Amino acid sequence: MERINFIKSVLGASAFVGISLAACNEKESLQSLIDNTKRKVTGKMFNFSCAKIEKVKVGIIGLGNRGSTLLQMFKYLIEKDYAEIIALCDIQSKKTKRASSILSKWQKNSADVYNSSDDDWKKVAKRDDIDLVIIATPWRMHTPMSLFCMENNKHVACEVPIAYKLEDCWKLTQTSEKTQKHCIMLENCNYNTEELWILNMIDEGVFGDITHTEGAYLHDLRALLLDDEYYQGQWRLKQHATRNGNFYTTHGLGPISFYLKIGRGDTFSYLTSMSTREKNLSSAAKQINHPMNSFKCGDMNNTLIKTKKGKSILLQFDVHTGRPYSRINKVVGTKAVHDGYPSRLYIDSEKPEYWGHSWLDKIEYDKYKQKYEHPIIKKLKKISQNFKQGHGGMDFIMIYRLIRCLNLGLPLDINIYDSVMWSAVTPLSELSTNNESQSIKFPDFTSGIWSKENDLEIMREI
């Protein structure tokens, strides 16, 4: 029964209609359970654009650590009359009060406040004067809120991950296609200066043919996870008590997917995943006599993904271990290699060398930095300096691009298929990790449209 409950929690309850669970240890049976989550989709939200929205009317649901930061990213857009915040929602009145105070400094009209009940967010979704809903709530609410908002005629921009069950990935895709509403995940690392620089070099042919990439979320979160207030109700810590896999895939995988043009000529084929034993988080919990001190999630998860074109991706996840922050950001090509944290670039010589391989010195490195700076950074670098609180400025660039695409009636940089493909790695990693690193095939959320070669929307100048 425990195993059945685990698989249900990862796939979703309806995955089990007509499927025998008696032999779910067998490879074919597990893959059948995954395949049984599939829903009919069309892929028609690729290159989807809606009518121009001269001023985007925005509602924000969730005004904690993340939501309050995203709110601040709207200052420039509001001053330029590109957007207006008209609804603020959180279950804690102190958070809506704080958000209203921030907003009053640079928006003339005050936003309506919703904080009277756990379901007040539905009132925001049902309003007929809102174009876009920003969702920045605990993970378990991301999918139901996104679905409800789309069903009530709203575009959705949701914090990461947009889903952590396969069935929910299918529901989100199907609902976006049915309602013809944008539904995207707010993956800010795709807008970071380093990642955009690498992407531009790839686009210009500096790396040649990409063969391998590595990304990660290596971030010591022990103090925050164990804090009584930082994650309300310690919702994030509870995930580590009951699950084991890669819970936070998208900071590494989002940029990598753009490097490899996933969904635009290539896609994920299969993965295998394993976790180490857990030691660090429980040790930290015991040191402070925390009531929760037993955790299922291993200290480090390693997930390997193979693409249809034969390229490989290594994703790592570790928020338990004391170490400097890193997303790795490794790109290996036939002509160049990049390693992040700190950023280093190697350019291969025209002829193979026996030895003497070394990273570019600072002078040569800086030449590449200047020559291949991404057009988005060139345009927004100065403005983004005023929004350093948004992860150094990349949060602002992300929100700017979102709103301007809606203003101009353009396809968004990140679409629903990107969002669910990147998020689906989490449940698949859990299934593989808990089944002796079994190789698991990826579902196709695009109905085969991924095979069409298309340019990345993020390479457009707007």
What residues fall within each predicted segment?
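N-terminal glycine-/serine-/threonine-rich beta1-alpha1-beta2 phosphate-ribose binding loop
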Residues: 2-154, 170-182
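C-terminal helical cap and adjacent loop that interface with cofactors, partners, or active-site loops
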Residues: 10, 29-30, 36-46, 69, ...
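Predominantly a Rossmann-like dinucleotide-binding segment in NAD(P)-dependent oxidoreductases
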Residues: 62, 67, 178-184, 189-295, ...
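ADP-ribose/adenylate-binding Rossmann-like module
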Residues: 153-165
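A short catalytic or substrate-binding loop motif that flags glycine-/basic-rich loops and adjacent residues
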Residues: 250, 294-299, 307-308, 322-323
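Active-site beta-strand termini and strand-to-loop segments that position acidic
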Residues: 303-309, 333
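Glycine-rich phosphate/pyrophosphate-binding beta-alpha loops
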Residues: 315-325
